[in-house]
Amino acid sequence: MIIGIPKEIKNNENRVALTPAGAKELVKRGHTVYVQHTAGENSGFPDSAYETVGAKILPSINDVYQTAEMIVKVKEPIAVEYPLVRKGQLVFTYFHFASDEKLTLAMMDSGSVCLAYETVENPDGTLPLLIPMSEVAGRMSIQEGARFLEKPQGGKGILLGGVPGVKPARVLVLGGGIVGYNAALMAAGMGADASSCTSSLVSEKMSRCSCGTSSILTCLPCSWVGA
């Protein structure tokens, strides 16, 4: 199969859909991999890293879409990419169609075959391609929260982990799924007193988790928390 990796052009998206290691595996299995010029640059992968493992570099996003049978991306195509998607072309990325009617209609009109990462399921119902995104979201939420506790950001000047003589902040995470678990784990790892309010089965793992010397993740079953 001819696989194309375009450069992500959605605002603030710096990731690339395929690493050189991934490209190497695909080439080894007989596929042809085309990567747009500088597609991996913002993730620390120069064009030369792809060329070394047998991938080929194309100069523009148009070239990638026109050449590839399957497009592999990180985020959904934005409006300027809609006309580039061809009938019968496979597009593999995070789509989140439910929140974007224009994208949904554009992909239907294109006649392409869309494979959404977030809907890929294991036999047990878990979502293996959504879990990494949820892990990142949970951990980033605590970093962002800690930043907005700072005085220059309009916060109260609270240091999440405290210092000798000053108690650490108390963090309550509502929900104990993948996002909530990683948020609580991150908060505890930064020295905060972290608790989770959840009825999720993931909470079993949380209740056994501790970070550092005093920050312990506590499971509080709270079925009364409404949706």
What are these regions (language model features)?
Residues 2, 8, 77-170:
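Glycine/serine-rich phosphate-binding loop and adjoining beta1-alpha1 elements at the start
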Residues 2-106:
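An N-terminal-biased, well-structured beta-alpha scaffold segment characteristic
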Residues 6-42, 152-207, 227:
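Glycine-rich phosphate/diphosphate-binding loop of Rossmann-like nucleotide-binding domains
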Residues 28-32, 55-56, 70-73, 109-113, ...:
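Generic secondary-structure signature for well-ordered alpha-helical cores
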Residues 58-70, 138-151, 227:
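Short, basic, helix/turn surface patches
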Residues 197, 209-211, 219-222:
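Cysteine-centered motifs
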Residues 203-204, 214-216:
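Intrinsic low-complexity, disordered N-terminal segments enriched in polar/charged/small residues
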